[in-house]
Amino acid sequence: MESLTLQPIVHIEGTINLPGSKSVSNRALLLAALAKGKTRLTNLLDSDDIRHMLNALTALGVQYQLSNNNTVCDIEGLAGSFHPQQPLELFLGNAGTAMRPLAAALSLGEHDIVLTGEPRMKERPIGHLVDALRQGGAKIDYLEQTDYPPLRVCGGFSGGSVDVDGTVSSQFLTALLMMAPLAQQDTTITIKGELVSKPYIDITLALINTFGGEIENQNYQRFMIKGGQQYQSPGKYLVEGDASSASYFLAAAAIKGGIVRVTGIGKNSLQGDIHFASVLEKMGATIRWGDDYIECERGKLKGIDMDMNTIPDAAMTIATTALFAEGETTIRNIYNWRVKETDRLSAMATELRKVGAMVDEGRDYLTVIPPKQLTTAEIKTYNDHRIAMCFSLVALSNTPITILDPGCTAKTFPDYFEKLASISHAKV
């Protein structure tokens, strides 16, 4: 297996232009494909998850042109739902942001499509979404294990009243919201339980609005959607920078800055993960907000105890930042870490212990007590891009750290380690 050893970094300073947001990129691609007219998407993320969506759209008859660096995409919209002429099998890797929305979008019309992916994708639950789609008339079969991909989707969704469990993943609701305006009849979606990762629903609603869709949001408990709508291309759409990816550079500044500025996101961004910066501020870092940047400067960091349900991806970065804080840090209400690219709660606890931390792993929380001195270790990354990036921060101590399978960052941030090196000053 490939590995990358990061030598101790003594100082961090500089500016990072962020790659496009994964969450925004895949939503925008799907909506542009379903819309009437041609859409130019700029600052599109160039990564594995986006390629899986693009490959699926090609198979489904969508025509598009990508720029040489894969960050500008001109898409000819279909002016409605997908109508593939023959049975298809779509391989979606481990891209939840492709699997869930496509399962919903393909529930419209009549066809025979199999959605499958990597072994880990077959362990990521999708039953709550399938249950909701079936309530609206969709014909969907599980091909292996009940409640998990691969799926056979044969269309049939027409609308009506559906309820969806909100406690596991906001992507199920996102998938329903993007598809429902194109259904023949009106749809009412009722949320069961507490809706997790609510800021991701705000991203979805903002994008639907940009493409001319109308949804009535009744306090995130019920959503009323008129059927028979048509998405309209906005012409051009700029994908903002990935706020989850910003977290590593902002945390690095909080630990060993110097001032680091990340550009492509700012105080008015769609993404909830910008509030990671506010968590760093609570820990003791200095944060400055601009319209299209966030700056962080080192401070004396103290441990915190916080509910981080609204920033689940960026909250992982707090777990490794906690290694450099005074006192213990507890990250609460993060059960949905367990259904991501890997069981992130278990994986983070295991790897944090390797570098010397004392860790209490609960069902839905993680407590980290930093050691006096971090120990060098080989970090297993579980084919999870965020674990690889989180543990790169250990190099901000006086201890080298080895990251196994560093290429797994290709899921969202292929050149992450090069970007980190560009603002790092190592021991000579």
UniProtKB/Swiss-Prot annotation:
Which compartments does it reside in?
Cytoplasm
UniProt GO molecular function: 3-phosphoshikimate 1-carboxyvinyltransferase activity
Q: Does the keyword Cell membrane apply?
A: no
Q: What taxonomic lineage is listed for the species of origin?
A: Bacteria, Pseudomonadati, Pseudomonadota, Gammaproteobacteria, Enterobacterales
Which major enzyme category is it?
A: transferase
Which Gene Ontology BP terms does the record give?
A: amino acid biosynthetic process; aromatic amino acid family biosynthetic process; chorismate biosynthetic process
The pathway that the record names for this protein is: Metabolic intermediate biosynthesis; chorismate biosynthesis; chorismate from D-erythrose 4-phosphate and phosphoenolpyruvate: step 6/7
Q: Which residues bind phosphoenolpyruvate?
A: 22, 96, 124, 171, 344, 386, 411
* E.C. number: 2.5.1.19
List of residues binding 3-phosphoshikimate: 22-23, 27, 169-171, 197, 313, 336, 340
Catalytic activity, reaction form: 3-phosphoshikimate + phosphoenolpyruvate = 5-O-(1-carboxyvinyl)-3-phosphoshikimate + phosphate
Please give the subunit comment from the record. Answer: Monomer.
What does the sequence similarity comment in the record state about its family?
Belongs to the EPSP synthase family.
Keywords associated with the record: Amino-acid biosynthesis, Aromatic amino acid biosynthesis, Cytoplasm, Transferase
Q: Which InterPro entries match?
A: Enolpyruvate_Tfrase_dom, Enolpyruvate_Tfrase_sf, EPSP_synthase, EPSP_synthase_CS, RNA3'P_cycl/enolpyr_Trfase_a/b
This chain's protein is named 3-phosphoshikimate 1-carboxyvinyltransferase
Q: Which organism is it from?
A: Proteus mirabilis (strain HI4320)
